[in-house]
């Protein structure tokens, strides 16, 4: 803080510290961190995974320049009732997921917890359907349990 408004005396340390503390609140990243806003907005509430019930299947169009319909599901989380969209990874993975199934979701792995690749606004992916891993279902190593 070498500006003209900064105190420059021998005992100016405390004043400089208070000034720096006050200035930090003008930076949005500091505000988010100090007030833990990311955790408050997170549907999983800081947990790595979450269980939910499939509300509906949806197909989302990929962003330009790609052209595809990405198969996703709307999931209502059991812990807090919030609805999120989760991607169904793998060939024909959507066929193993039915409405009212219980699924486990986790973050999709995008930059700073955001969406990944060309799927707009989707931050989560389906990991398990019932007690079965979605990856194993797609590969044909497991069969979905019939009720």
Swiss-Prot record:
Coiled-coil stretches: none
CDD domains the record matches: Ribosomal_S23
Xref: Gene3D superfamilies: Nucleic acid-binding proteins (2.40.50.140)
One of the GO BP terms on file: translation
Gene Ontology CC entries for this record: small ribosomal subunit
Keyword tags: Ribonucleoprotein, Ribosomal protein, RNA-binding, rRNA-binding
SUPFAM superfamilies for this protein: Nucleic acid-binding proteins
GO molecular function, one term: structural constituent of ribosome
Pfam families, A to Z: Ribosom_S12_S23
Family from the record: Belongs to the universal ribosomal protein uS12 family.
Role summary: With S4 and S5 plays an important role in translational accuracy. Located at the interface of the 30S and 50S subunits.
Assembly description: Part of the 30S ribosomal subunit.
Protein name: Small ribosomal subunit protein uS12
Organism: Methanococcus maripaludis (strain C5 / ATCC BAA-1333)
């Amino acid at each position: 803080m070498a500006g003209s408004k900064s105190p420059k005396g021998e005992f100016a340390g405390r004043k400089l510290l208070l000034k720096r503390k006050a200035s930090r609140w003008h930076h949005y990243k500091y505000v988010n961190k100090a007030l833990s806003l990311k955790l408050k907005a997170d549907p999983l509430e800081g947990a790595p995974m979450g269980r939910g019930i499939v509300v509906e299947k949806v197909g989302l169009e990929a962003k330009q320049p790609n052209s595809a319909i990405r198969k996703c599901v709307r999931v209502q989380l059991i812990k807090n009732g919030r609805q999120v969209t989760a991607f169904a990874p793998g060939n024909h993975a959507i066929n193993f997921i039915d409405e009212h199934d219980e699924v486990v979701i986790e973050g999709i792995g995008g930059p700073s917890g955001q969406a990944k690749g060309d799927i707009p606004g989707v931050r989560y992916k389906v990991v398990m359907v019932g007690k079965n891993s979605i990856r194993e279902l797609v590969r044909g190593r497991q069969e979905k349990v019939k009720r």
